[in-house]
Structures are given as structure tokens and as C-alpha cells.
Amino acid sequence: MNTIDKKQSLGGFEKYLPLWIPLCMAIGVLLSLYTTLGERIEALAIGGISIPIGICLFFMMYPAVLNLKGSELRKLKDNPQPILLTLFSNWIIAPLVGFVLAKMFLSDHDELFVAVILLSASPCTAMVLVWGSMADGNQEQNVVNTSLNTITIMIFYAPLVALLTGIQNIEIDRWGLAISVLVFIGLPILAGLLTRKIVIPMKGETWFDETYRPVLGKFSIISLLTTLIVLFALNGNTILGSPEYLLLISIPLLLGFVIVVGINIAMTKLFRLKYREAAVTVIIGSSSHFEIAIATAIAAYGVGSVAALGTTMGLFWEIPIMLGLVYLTRYLGRKNFW
């Protein structure tokens, strides 16, 4: 098994995300019981969009799109097979598996059904750079795939979500869905491109990659955890009154992950990918962009909705599961599976 020269790892704070996430959920529930934070946040809104949540969502998304490098897309022609397999998994396999499982377990719970679709139809563009590096995967392929995901999510996400929810006869504001994608992905992409255009000529690409992006990455995680606290502060009564919602959505999410990972491992074996390419394909093809799923759920159903609450469970499970997947791919690599 080959390794890359410079391997990324989670920082001290990020290593404990599996602890911070449930802690923030608990803090949010306690705040809902003993304070009026939820009501005050709901009052800070313009046109139905919560200003504090909007700020948090922007800083969740903005650091991720700083990874977008148009120049990297030219490398697609060098070794297209693993990249195309990853796109196939992201846009065909994962959404279909999510739809089937949501139909099996959540047919009577429209907002939870939508939450599963929002998660399964959103390929990751940020954390997979770290997961792929920790697995000693091909980082050039990783950057190309995340750049492609950033672009394709602008094109395919809203139509795919509308299609899959429409098959289930769930009414969703399609224009609102498209607008939320433009706002919560389009604006951060624009800001990211402008940042690269302005900052790199001034400070250099090394400073941008090694100093600026890591600092913004901290803002992303803090914004993510703040959003969790707010969401659970607004949904505390719902959670305590109906804790089965969290269990209900966890079943298709966990089953879906196992199925999609299994398909991706089999697919990379079938197409005889080498370890470094297979690891990245499995990791990216099996991950979700929980930030855009949360943002879209809030835009479509409101900050205090069951749909928004449901998408947070994608985040709850994603971090520990992806860490486990890193260890699984490394184990398979040591056993010369690929």
C-alpha cells in the first residue's frame, strides 16, 4: 500500500467532535427548558430567515468551498474511472438507497422522509479531504472529486430532491429549494472564489492553504456546533415529547450507510481500483454534506421543524462512522483487498 507524503489529521478540537455533538444537543435541550433563547432567536428573522442561523450556515459552508480549485478539474482526464465511479455513487446509488429506506421506514413521516432525502442526495465537499488523507488515499483525486461535488451540487441537488420527494407525493416548495441552494451554496462559492482571487496573490497559496483555511475551518466547526445548540433549543419540547423521531430517522440513515459502503467497496473491487483510489472513492461516495442538508431543511420547513431536527442526526452519526470507515479502508488495504 502506498502512502502520501503529507497526511492530514484531525486537530485536537476536531478529534472530540463525537463528544461535542451530543454535548451541544444536550445544551440545546436544556436551554429550551430553562430559557427563552428559542423565542428570542425566532424573533430575529427577516423574510422568515433567522439571522443568527443564516450567519452560522454561511460560516458552515464558506470554509468548505475554499477547497474548490478549477485548475484541479483538468486532472479528470488523467485517471477518470475512480472519479466517475465516485460521482455515480454520490448522485445515483446514495440517493436511491436513501429513497428506498425512507419509503420503508418513514412513509408516514413526511418531514423525516425529506430529511433522509436531503442527506442522501448531498455529496460531501469538505471533511472528506481529511478522511481521505487519514486513509492514505489519493489526495489529487480527493481534491478533484470535492471540486466536482461543489459544482454538481449546484446543478443536481434541488432537482433530485424535488424528484424524489415528488415520487412520494410530498409537497415541497421547489422554488424555495432552488433559492436555498443558490443562497447557502451559491453565495459561499462566490465568496470563496473572490477570497482565492484576492488573498492568494497577496499572501501566496501556501499561506492560504496552511494558515487561512485551517483558521476558517475552526469557524466552520464552531458555527456547526452553534447551529446544533440553536436547533435543539428550538426543538427541545418536540424531542422530549417524541424522542422516537430521533430513533426513526437513525434506522434508515445507519442502514443506508452500511448498504452504500458495501456497494462502493464491491464496485471498487469489481473495477480493480488500486488502494489509494479505492479508499477515496469509498469515503467520498459514502459521505453526506450535512451542512447543506441542514441549511435546506431550515429554509424549506423552518428552524424549529422536525425536518431540520432530522438532518442533525446525519451529523450525529456521520463523524464517528466516517472515522470507522477510515480504519476499515486501511484494514482492507493491509489485507491487500484491492
Which stretches of residues belong to each language-model region?
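Alpha-helical transmembrane segments of multi-pass small-molecule/ion transporters
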Residues: 1-66, 71-286, 290-338
